[in-house]
Amino acid sequence: MTIGSFFSSLLFWRNSQDQEAQRGRMQEIDLSVHTIKSHGGRVASKHKHDWIILVILIAIEIGLNLISPFYRYVGKDMMTDLKYPFKDNTVPIWSVPVYAVLLPIIVFVCFYLKRTCVYDLHHSILGLLFAVLITGVITDSIKVATGRPRPNFYWRCFPDGKELYDALGGVVCHGKAAEVKEGHKSFPSGHTSWSFAGLTFLSLYLSGKIKAFNNEGHVAKLCLVIFPLLAACLVGISRVDDYWHHWQDVFAGALIGTLVAAFCYRQFYPNPYHEEGWGPYAYFKAAQERGVPVTSSQNGDALRAMSLQMDSTSLENMESGTSTAPR
């Protein structure tokens, strides 16, 4: 064995040890930093003020649903456009939190079980709840302030079809108080705004996780991202078909939900088309503080393949007695 081959072997052994140490540090971080057991409480405690604000938003949302809306003047001439049938909801109100909140959380948990990143799980749930609750508060605040009558207001006001008006030509309703109250909450659509808030957040989350915009031309990924948005659109259409909302109500609700969801998502995650769009900001910050380079799973596989290839080349050079050291 030549002196050059000896030093090449020594250098290769040293590099191998450094690589093993680096892998060990990365594995240690993956196992100890990103789990609920080790850092779940710490992450939640760091965002305790956010959770307090969420509780306040819930209280505001409950209060907005208890107070009476503005009883806008409704005259006899206006009743022609408000005489649509009083139908049941195609999408029941109880189902909205199920598909707009519970379903996305189930998806978040599935990704957590695969990657065990507590930052991702915590921030996705927190961002989703902020999206739907802020949307709900905005929607119901506008509902209460505007008091726009629903398309089926006539049958809420006059369930027996017997019309009654005051001296100014305004309606004097004799229907159930709760139905008349609900009849003044047309603008904007709550079903639609909640649907777009929760499902737009889910769509953005999925697009980042599956790298839907990585310029590789996988249309199947795009279909998966579009599906939640399509579901939200169908909910909005059902509100018009059921004569519970005017089309303007649905459009406004969709706009509110989409914008709020996008803003809330970007508070915790990079753009889905970004190289680091697959993870939350906090994940990369934690890794950076520990001096560990973080890549996506795909990039990690590529780096490992390159490392194995370099190791294989070095071994071949050693066996052939060829030095790789600079001459």
From Swiss-Prot:
InterPro entries: P_Acid_Pase_2/haloperoxi_sf, P_Acid_Pase_2/haloperoxidase, PA_PP_rel. GO terms for cellular component: membrane. The gene is LPP1. Plays a general role in cellular responses to stress, may be by attenuating the signal produced by phospholipases. Exhibits both diacylglycerol pyrophosphate (DGPP) phosphatase and phosphatidate (PA) phosphatase activities. Substrate preference is diacylglycerol pyrophosphate > phosphatidate. Keywords: Hydrolase, Hypersensitive response, Membrane, Plant defense, Transmembrane, Transmembrane helix. PANTHER family: LIPID PHOSPHATE PHOSPHATASE, LIPID PHOSPHATE PHOSPHATASE 1. The chain crosses the membrane at residues 51-71, 93-113, 118-138, 187-207, 217-237, 244-264. It comes from the Eukaryota. The keyword Transmembrane applies. Strongly expressed in leaves, moderately in roots, weakly in floral hamps and flower buds, and not detected in adult flowers and seedpods. Belongs to the PA-phosphatase related phosphoesterase family. SMART domains: acidPPc (SM00014). GO terms for molecular function: phosphatidate phosphatase activity. It holds the Pfam family PAP2. This is Lipid phosphate phosphatase 1. Its EC number is 3.1.3.-. PA phosphatase activity inhibited by N-ethylmaleimide with an IC(50) value of 10 mM. The keyword Transmembrane applies.
